[in-house]
Amino acid sequence: MLLLNPGPVTLTERVRRSLLQPDLCHRESEFFDLQDEARQRLVAAYELDPAEWTAVLMTGSGTAAVESMIAALVPKDGKLLVIENGVYGERITQIATQYGIAHDVLKHEWMQAPDLAQIGARLDAGGYSHVAVIHHETTTGRLNDLGAIAEVCRSRGVKMLVDGVSSFGAEAIDFAGGDIDAVAATANKCLHGVPGAAFVIVRRSALAKAASRTYYLDLGRLAKLQDQRNTPFTPSVHAYYALVEALREFDEAGGWRARHAHYKALADQAQAGLAARGMPLVLAEGESSVVLRAYRLPQGVTYETLHDGLKARGFVIYAGQGGLSKELFRISTMGAIQAADVERLLEGFTALTQ
């Protein structure tokens, strides 16, 4: 079965075999070697200076990393502006509300790109320490323009907290601009690991001021203990095995730029084939990521018909969310997928929509 949902992904055999490594106590030096390698490779993935940046690992989904980031890095006297244009921006608002973090929301329609003028106007009203934004909003497949948002923040001295859960490892992220304090992400999307290992790439200067609002996801404590080759709790050891093996593969294949190019070729192939079959891209050309794209359901064919028919042929696609569930479907090209797989997928669409 090939998974065309936005994580978990279809694994390579090499990563799958890594799950068969010997059982390992998380208090032994061998585990801390594994933890150290994962952290070092994550920082190196975007060629970051380890004196300025660190990777903090945790056991959980990508949402755990996002929650840890938001809970720790908005100071008690700070204020957060959440940019919403999909389900995952709304989730950050829910996290901020749950923790009692001072925040406002700049809400957009799900099909809308963030309005830079509105962001600037909100920030000009004053009082904001941070902006939270989703890099790749998988609700629609939109790649929000981090660079443009960063420019708005930079002139106003506001830092960014980025949900990079479904972009880290495949899309460009400008860590060098000085505007980003942290990016939250996970092993089981663009890095091709398995669910259970998540992380925050965080600026050390921001980490030094981290608030402690949560017990299990306390970013400052996790970082401190990991720097000491320690861990506060039992991690998902085999998920760490898989993450390290996936990162080795990632580096050997050419890093995020090579992964971006591979995803783009597959996504463009799928997009062209689906358009020819009457299923156009939902967003305007150039607004989608290379990771996932959303398509209009064909006239007279339900999502359930497509899903079940394609699953019988060995493919899992993904439904639209919320009010979009009757309008669109989504296809991700993450994981161990090749051009021949996309061609077989398109043949399946032909059979189901004729």
Protein language model regions, located:
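A glycine-/small-polar-enriched, mobile loop at the entrance of the PLP active site in fold-type I
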Residues: 1-58
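Active-site C-terminal subdomain of aminotransferase-like
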Residues: 10-11, 188-272
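Conserved beta-loop-alpha segment that forms the PLP phosphate-binding cup at the N-terminus of a helix
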Residues: 42, 52-81, 89-92
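Substrate-binding/gating loop at the entrance of the active-site cleft, primarily
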Residues: 83-101, 109
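Active-site phosphate-binding strand-loop segment of PLP-dependent enzymes
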Residues: 113-169
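Conserved active-site segment immediately N-terminal to the catalytic lysine
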Residues: 176-188
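Conserved PLP-binding catalytic core of the aspartate aminotransferase-like
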Residues: 280-310
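PLP-dependent enzyme catalytic core of the Aspartate aminotransferase-like
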Residues: 327-354
